[in-house]
Swiss-Prot record:
Name of the featured protein: Universal stress protein B
GO annotations of cellular component type: plasma membrane
Keyword Aminoacyl-tRNA synthetase part of the UniProt annotation: no
The family this protein is said to belong to: Belongs to the universal stress protein B family.
Upper lineage: Bacteria, Pseudomonadati, Pseudomonadota, Gammaproteobacteria, Enterobacterales
Entry membrane topology: Multi-pass membrane protein
Signal peptide interval: none
Species this protein is from: Pectobacterium carotovorum subsp. carotovorum (strain PC1)
Gene: uspB
Superkingdom of origin: Bacteria
Keywords: Cell inner membrane, Cell membrane, Membrane, Transmembrane, Transmembrane helix
Length: 111
């Protein structure tokens, strides 16, 4: 039988790997955004997005832009493809983090 703790840690590792993939895809999306739509790049603070002085309100704007699928009207197909990829990875990572929290609560109750 598979250990519950081993399964939990495997789930955590998968979640961390997906977070790294999401982070990498978001960086590439910002590079594509800088070339195809400089105004939107400035609107979401693309240059300072991953810095310590980045503005969270502008970062949330980009997340909202992608989550609401407002990118579908964009003129660049590469940008649309990158946004769809980032959106899928965001939803997957969110679901995995939720599953980890639920399994952690279940393990606390069970043991």
């Amino acid at each position: 039988m598979i250990s519950t703790f081993a399964l939990f840690w495997a789930l955590c590792i998968v979640c961390i790997i997906n977070m790294a993939r999401y982070y990498s895809s978001l960086r590439v999306l910002l590079l594509v955004l800088r070339d195809c739509d400089p105004l939107l790049y400035q609107y979401v603070d693309g240059g300072g997005f991953f810095t310590s002085h980045g503005q969270p309100s502008k970062q949330i704007r980009l997340v909202g832009y992608i989550y609401a699928q407002r990118y579908l009207d964009h003129h660049d197909p590469e940008f649309i493809r990158r946004c769809e990829r980032v959106r899928g990875q965001f939803l997957l990572t969110t679901a995995l983090c939720g599953l980890i929290v639920i399994s952690l609560i279940a393990m606390m109750i069970w043991y």
